[in-house]
């Protein structure tokens, strides 16, 4: 039982004034009464005055962690370890049990929502979500991800039968999302959800800071007008993009028309296509697509696609990955220090190092990990190189799935395979040796002769001088315990 007064800091959402009772910008009370017909010539707002919806919405300046509601929202990163004022406060008030629970979640992708208990909070549950990082050239992707955050939180609350939800501002300052743009998405997504599923939620609280309050108070009337007059005033202030019926951002040029008869062969409609207006060719977003990818794969499987065509197709695919790797923000993957370039081996070849223990497979976006691998390796693989993989003290959660490795092997450019001269597998286990043998024998047989199982750093140093490779301290400590102090020895690697 909590000591007397321990929860005096918490605020009951039910006693907070709803948006319908808050005075408008002129400082006058908002007129009550039902909706009337819009006068002739008046514009119809896509977000009409709804007193019943306004009574469910609350704007509150305060710490979301202090809300007494069914669930509150925590904004974090993909490993759920972000340090920001919202998360810090939630962890502080919830107690150490939350940290233990978070480790079981195994991360959260951008736009997703995951549920934990509230523990020592007044709220029964915490819904964790990950907002997007904002870059102007990827604005559309960021908008879609942010919409998914709010929509998935609301959907989860509905599925769990929650009565009230307390939202923080999901986009943190470090993710650089403009507050105005983020607020538009937040408000319209909640509005559209309440229009359809209003019976599922009694209260939705927007918990904001003093800096955020002004923006929310200015934009709330656009999506939650408190009178017919406010509705009419707000029409001209609405942005051009108000999303679809769910509030989701829509990019017209990316909408694809689905064929009425997808099973019919392309030849059946060939003549019809000739008479269509040719002026539209090249005007849509997919004009540069070269052929039917699925058809090319099918022909390849049937042996009907030439080697040159397959090579060209593979090169185009790799170039797309490389382009993404050069433009996306991969700082969270780089911070793991799981892949880095070191010196050169005895033959003057570049040395790339992979630290298995630093790869939290279950907590990171593996697609971003692949992009980072391409980003780091593309220039190195232009000439001969060697790869050192430290398997030292890895756990089950560090082991890369064979399907991921096969997919990576299929995606990377031919120079990666051609110019790789040796792969040193340091501190292998019996299980890793068996797995490596199966993988290099049956999945990527071209790699088998290049793999060398290295039991100790003594062996590794016969191929790579100690001063030419950066080794993590825990690897040095492990090797000293298992194999004794470092000393110079001869090995078959001298011939490599």
From Swiss-Prot:
InterPro entries: CRAL-TRIO_dom, CRAL-TRIO_dom_sf, Macro_dom, Macro_dom-like, Macro_GDAP2
Superkingdom of origin: Eukaryota
Chain segments carrying region Disordered: 25-48
All residue ranges annotated as the Macro domain in the record: 44-224
Entries under Gene3D superfamilies matching the protein: CRAL-TRIO lipid binding domain (3.40.525.10), Leucine Aminopeptidase, subunit E, domain 1 (3.40.220.10)
Residue stretches making up the CRAL-TRIO domain: 329-483
Entry-linked PANTHER family: GANGLIOSIDE INDUCED DIFFERENTIATION ASSOCIATED PROTEIN 2-RELATED, GANGLIOSIDE-INDUCED DIFFERENTIATION-ASSOCIATED PROTEIN 2
Entry similarity comment: Belongs to the GDAP2 family.
The protein's name in its UniProt record: Ganglioside-induced differentiation-associated protein 2
Organism: Xenopus laevis (African clawed frog)
């Amino acid at each position: 039982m909590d000591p007397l007064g321990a929860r005096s800091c918490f605020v009951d959402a039910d006693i907070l004034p709803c948006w319908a009772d808050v005075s408008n910008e002129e400082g006058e009370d908002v007129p009550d009464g039902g909706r009337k017909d819009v006068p002739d010539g008046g514009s119809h707002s896509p977000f009409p005055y709804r007193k019943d919806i306004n009574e469910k919405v609350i704007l509150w300046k305060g710490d979301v962690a202090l809300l007494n509601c069914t669930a509150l929202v925590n904004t974090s990163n993909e490993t759920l370890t972000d340090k920001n004022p919202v998360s810090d406060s939630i962890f502080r008030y919830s107690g150490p049990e939350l940290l233990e629970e978070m480790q079981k979640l195994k991360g959260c992708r951008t736009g997703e929502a995951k549920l934990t208990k509230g523990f020592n909070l007044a709220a029964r549950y915490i819904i964790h979500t990950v907002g997007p990082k904002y870059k102007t050239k990827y604005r559309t992707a960021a908008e879609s991800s942010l919409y998914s955050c709010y929509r998935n939180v609301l959907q989860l609350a509905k599925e769990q039968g929650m009565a009230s939800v307390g939202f923080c501002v999901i986009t943190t300052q470090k993710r650089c999302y403009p507050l105005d743009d983020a607020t538009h998405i937040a408000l319209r997504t909640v509005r559209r959800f309440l229009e359809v599923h209003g019976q599922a939620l009694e209260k939705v609280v927007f918990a904001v800071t003093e800096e955020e309050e002004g923006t929310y108070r200015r934009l709330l009337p656009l999506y939650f007008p408190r009178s017919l007059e406010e509705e009419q005033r707000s029409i001209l202030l609405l942005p051009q993009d108000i999303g679809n019926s769910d509030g989701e951002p829509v990019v017209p040029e990316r909408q694809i028309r689905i064929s009425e008869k997808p099973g019919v062969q392309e030849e059946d409609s060939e003549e019809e296509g000739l008479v269509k207006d040719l002026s539209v060719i090249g005007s849509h977003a997919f004009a540069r697509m070269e052929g039917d990818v699925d058809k090319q794969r099918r022909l390849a499987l049937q042996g009907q696609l030439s080697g040159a065509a397959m090579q060209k197709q593979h090169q185009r695919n790799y170039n797309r990955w490389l382009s993404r790797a050069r433009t996306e923000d991969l700082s969270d993957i780089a911070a793991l220090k799981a892949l880095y370039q070191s010196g050169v081996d005895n033959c003057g070849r570049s040395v790339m190092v992979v630290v298995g223990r630093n790869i939290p497979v279950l907590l990171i976006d593996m697609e971003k990990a692949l992009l980072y691998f391409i980003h780091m390796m593309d220039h190195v693989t232009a000439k001969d190189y060697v790869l050192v993989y430290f398997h030292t003290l890895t756990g089950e959660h560090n082991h890369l799935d064979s399907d991921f490795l096969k997919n990576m092997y299929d995606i990377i450019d031919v120079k990666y395979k051609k110019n790789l001269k040796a792969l040193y597998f340091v501190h292998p286990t019996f299980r890793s040796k068996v797995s490596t043998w199966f993988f290099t024998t049956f999945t990527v047989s071209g790699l088998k002769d290049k793999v060398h199982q290295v039991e100790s750093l003594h062996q590794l140093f016969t191929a790579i001088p100690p001063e030419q490779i950066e080794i993590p301290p825990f690897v040095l400590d492990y090797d000293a315990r298992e194999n004794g102090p470092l000393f110079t020895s001869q090995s078959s690697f001298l011939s490599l």
